[in-house]
Design a protein with these regions (language model features):
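Carbohydrate-binding surfaces in secreted/extracellular proteins
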Residues: 12, 66-94
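Extracellular beta-strand elements of beta-rich domains used
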Residues: 74, 117-121
Length: 122
């Protein structure tokens, strides 16, 4: 993606194999500037923001199973970030603290392995 993308969604069927967390990244503007929507091995589902330092914007309890495929979707509408599992909204947050309004998309993993076959952008 490019740094010109604004409102879009990214989705992928992902499987964690041995990582601390993994999922989708959006509005990427470099290595230290992006949003995350991730499944965490400590049984959390999290939306976070990397702006030189990582900040959790919102997290909820979520029973995680390694080697299980999850359909994740992250939708970005202006300063609102919405997280879906299997096409159902499970978490959302508004970022009012200098929100990122544009940027690319991709996958992110923390200390381990994440498996997917495709990424869909709309």
């Amino acid at each position: 993606g490019t740094n010109l993308w604004k409102n879009y969604s990214i989705s992928s069927n992902i499987m964690l194999q041995s990582s601390n967390s993994g999922g989708l990244v959006s509005r990427v503007q470099g290595v230290k500037k992006y949003y995350t929507y991730e499944i965490c091995k400590d049984n959390k589902l999290r939306i976070g923001k990397m702006n030189n330092e990582y900040k959790i914007l919102k997290e909820i309890e979520f029973q995680v199973e390694f080697f299980k495929e999850y359909n994740l979707k992250m939708m970005l509408v202006n300063n609102k970030i919405i997280g879906y599992i299997d096409n159902k909204i499970v978490i959302d947050v508004d970022d009012f603290d200098f929100p990122f309004m544009k940027g690319g998309a991709g996958l992110g993993v923390n200390n381990g392995t994440l498996v997917t076959e495709q990424i869909i952008l709309n």
